[in-house]
From Swiss-Prot:
The keyword Glycoprotein does not apply. The keyword Cytoplasm does not apply. Keywords: 4Fe-4S, Iron, Iron-sulfur, Isoprene biosynthesis, Metal-binding, Oxidoreductase. Its EC number is 1.17.7.3. It comes from Brucella melitensis biotype 2 (strain ATCC 23457). This is 4-hydroxy-3-methylbut-2-en-1-yl diphosphate synthase (flavodoxin). GO terms for molecular function: 4 iron, 4 sulfur cluster binding; 4-hydroxy-3-methylbut-2-en-1-yl diphosphate synthase activity (ferredoxin); 4-hydroxy-3-methylbut-2-enyl-diphosphate synthase activity (flavodoxin); iron ion binding. [4Fe-4S] cluster binds at C307, C310, C353, E360. Pfam families: GcpE. Its cofactor is [4Fe-4S] cluster. It is an enzyme of class 1 (oxidoreductase). Converts 2C-methyl-D-erythritol 2,4-cyclodiphosphate (ME-2,4cPP) into 1-hydroxy-2-methyl-2-(E)-butenyl 4-diphosphate. Belongs to the IspG family. One of its GO terms (biological process) is isopentenyl diphosphate biosynthetic process, methylerythritol 4-phosphate pathway.
Length: 420
């Protein structure tokens, strides 16, 4: 596994050198930053709801969005979705997620084949027995015809059973057989690599192929992607399938992908969270961004540092202020990205008492140290490491919010450009 040193923040890390793939103009792999992507859960045939969700995911920061293409009505809707998104200013690459009949849908709906930026193929259900290679080849040939990349996405829940049985039988005949888990991992890796080799034999370039091998257990994911990284230089899409809901899904995905990313493995990621009923689908985008930003690999939104609180901070003022600023940042980022280039590098500190408050506030671009329990009701504010004022009275929170807004305007806004 070859590597090079890449620095996206101030933290260099060894990056596995993969072959870059252009997905609708977004580069995945090579020396490009790790890309964040997501997937809709709407009925793709419902153009209005799908456009609305893709737009929301794109506004949240998803750089690629995958949609289900499972029947004729879905395939027929794809060009309409693409056109509507472009009219709304959302030029985000759309990936078609195909299972079972992808070869037929792409052939019957050429406008869909053209509108999509990438095709996702699952080797485990692209076809069965004597039809398998033919139907796989049909999709690959369609990708060649329309000059589209493909993701060969193996999933342990739909693993090629013929390949798995062959490897299990071969393993059983060995003198010191491997565990069933090890054989399954090998089958997943082989399924991806065999399919990639077949695609290349058909004529698809390596710069048009992305691989993924999704499982639902953290240790399996780490093992499988480590094997893939050692045995190929294809661009890799990371994702823990069926990660689950809430904190469990966030922790499991972050644990697995954090380890792989730290080793330089992974060119694009998706955090597959099960949303709560009526929940916000954009949550998975936010978690993916926060994972990459927390690890120091990319910058997406200003960082808000806040202390966890203790017996010195019985007041909730600092918690409420930190939450307000964080929500304000998330809400305004789509506009700020255009209006204030570089604002994602901003750091804000909202601290709750005198112990660590002043020190942490000095390290941030702009920070405030609110009074803890029994402390003088005043709050020193630090800008670029220097104390600039002390806020007092019931309007401390509102005053600091205005100072943050002014700082952003002065540092990243038009006035700064004119002055320079």
């Amino acid at each position: 596994m070859s590597s090079e040193t890449v620095s996206y923040f101030s933290h260099p890390f060894p990056r596995r050198q993969s072959v870059g793939v252009s997905v609708g103009g977004v580069i995945v792999g090579g020396s490009a930053p790790v890309v964040v992507q997501s997937m809709t859960n709407t009925d793709t045939a419902d153009v209005d709801s799908t456009v609305a969700q893709v737009a929301a995911l794109h506004r949240a920061g998803s750089e690629i969005v995958r949609i289900t293409v499972d029947r004729d009505e879905s395939a027929a809707a794809v060009p309409k979705i693409r056109e509507r998104l472009e009219r709304l200013g959302h030029d985000v690459p759309l990936v078609g997620d195909f299972h079972y009949i992808g070869h037929k849908l792409l052939a019957d709906h050429p406008a869909c084949a053209e509108a999509l930026a990438k095709y996702r193929i699952n080797p485990g259900n692209v076809g069965f027995k004597d039809k398998k290679d033919k139907q796989f080849a049909d999709i690959v040939e369609m990708a060649i015809r329309y000059d589209k990349p493909v993701r060969i996405g193996v999933n342990w829940g739909s693993l090629d059973q013929e390949l798995l049985t062959t490897l299990m039988d071969r393993n059983q005949a060995e003198g010191a057989p491997l565990s069933a888990q090890d054989v399954m991992r090998e089958a997943i890796v082989q399924s991806a690599l065999i399919s990639a080799n077949l695609a290349e034999e058909i004529g698809l370039g390596r710069d048009k192929i992305i691989l993924s091998a999704k499982v639902s257990q953290v240790q399996d994911l780490i093992a499988v992607y480590t094997m893939l990284a050692q045995r190929s230089n294809h661009a890799l899409h990371l994702g823990l399938t069926e990660a689950g809901m809430g904190t469990k899904g966030i922790v499991a995905s972050s644990a697995a992908m954090g380890i792989l990313l730290q080793q330089g493995i992974g060119d694009t990621i998706r955090i597959s969270l099960t949303p709560e009923p009526g929940g916000d689908r954009t949550r998975e985008v936010q978690v993916a961004q926060e994972l990459l930003q927390t690890m120091g690999f990319r910058q997406f939104v200003p960082i808000v540092a806040a202390c966890p609180g203790c017996g010195r901070t019985t007041s909730t003022v600092f918690q409420e202020l930190a939450q307000t600023i964080q929500e304000d940042i998330r809400r305004n980022m789509p506009l700020w990205r255009e209006k204030y280039p570089g604002v994602e590098a901003l750091s804000v500190a909202v601290m709750g008492c005198i112990v660590n408050g002043p020190g942490e506030s000095k390290h941030a671009d702009i920070g405030i140290s609110l009074p803890g329990t029994g402390e003088t009701p005043s709050a020193p504010v630090f800008v670029d490491g220097k104390k600039v004022t002390t806020l007092r009275g019931p309007g401390i929170a509102e005053d600091f919010q205005k100072m943050v807004a002014d700082y952003i305007e002065n540092r990243f806004g038009l006035g700064r450009k004119i002055a320079s």
